[in-house]
Amino acid sequence: MIMNPTAIKHVVVDGHSLTLESFVAIARYNATVELAPSALEAMKKSRALAEKIAAEGRVAYGITTGFGEFQKVAVPKEMSNQLSTNLILSHCTAAGEPYADEIVRGMMLLRANALCGGVSGVRPILVEMLLEMLNKGVTPVVPQKGSLGSSGDLAPLAHMTLPMLGKGEAMYEGVKMPGAEAMAKAGIKTLDTLVSKEGLGMTNGTCAMTSVGALALYDSICAAQLGDVIASMSFEGLTGLRNAFDPRIHQVRGQKGQMLVAANMRKLLDGSEILDNCQKDRVQDAYALRCIPQLHGACRDALDYVREKVEIELNAVTDLSLIHISEPTRHAQIS
């Protein structure tokens, strides 16, 4: 079962407690968001260590080195900011029709939530800006084609970042316009540049595919729930035999989804005057009626499995590199 996301009006983003319902409430139904104080402190510590690593010249991927095949190239501290900004600009290579606003809003939320984990070494202002854009309705225009998938939704996330730099395009109040104009109309100050590590921090994640998947999962769960309602109407119209939903039958089978659907069918058909008053001239129905719990239940079990994996990914940090803080010395370990 799933609760109604429209009942969720406000969500505190902390990096670890996002649910499918709260995700949909923000991405699709425009629930407001705020940054958890604990996440703010974690990001401040992480950023301080990233700056320390850069100042010491330690070898750390994406902080003091280039990217990909250029990982062995040392990057001088004075060039690290430009390198981060260039990473965004160079990866804006997606093509095709733009994603729906709800998918892009989901991407923004997931990127902010991942950065709230406090292991990416970025400034809190990036998360604060993403959340402000969500609250004020500035949605970057992000083309659908061109992601690397599990290696990172690099191109979609680069396009998502452009309006934060006063570039690209965005939707605001239902109108597509230059990103700088949308941000100005919403009263959001843009950034002149990113700083070291932030190019990777904004792009190295699975936020696009997870946003698409989470919204599809929510719609699939809703469809499964409606499937039981439709099945009950068919069952009633064909004057089926309700003993097929006897809980004892499904308890000895032990399948969670099957038991759930059988209970739902009993509830939906309880008090049916048609079934109470019809003549029974058979001992069992056709498979299509008596096996509704087995069929629908298998779908419910599959959706439960997918939900478990999606909700892990909603709160996952998929950045590279990661800065792990060892308390109380606050020594940084890079992975």
Regions found by a protein language model. Give the residues of each.
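Glycine-rich loop at the start of a catalytic domain that most often binds anionic cofactors/ligands
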Residues: E69-S84
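Active-site cavity-forming subdomains of large catalytic enzyme subunits
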Residues: C92, G96-A100, V104-Q255
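N- or domain-start disorder-to-order transition segments that initiate the globular core
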Residues: N4-G57
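Short, hydrophobic/aliphatic alpha-helical segments
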Residues: A39-V59, M129-Q144, G187-T193, S321-L322, ...
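Single conserved hydrophobic/aromatic residue that forms the stacking wall/gate
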Residues: I323-S335
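Acidic, low-complexity proline/glycine-rich segments
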Residues: H10-L20, A184-T203, N264, L268-Q279, ...
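Terminal amphipathic helices with adjacent charged low-complexity linkers/tails
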Residues: M79, E236-D301
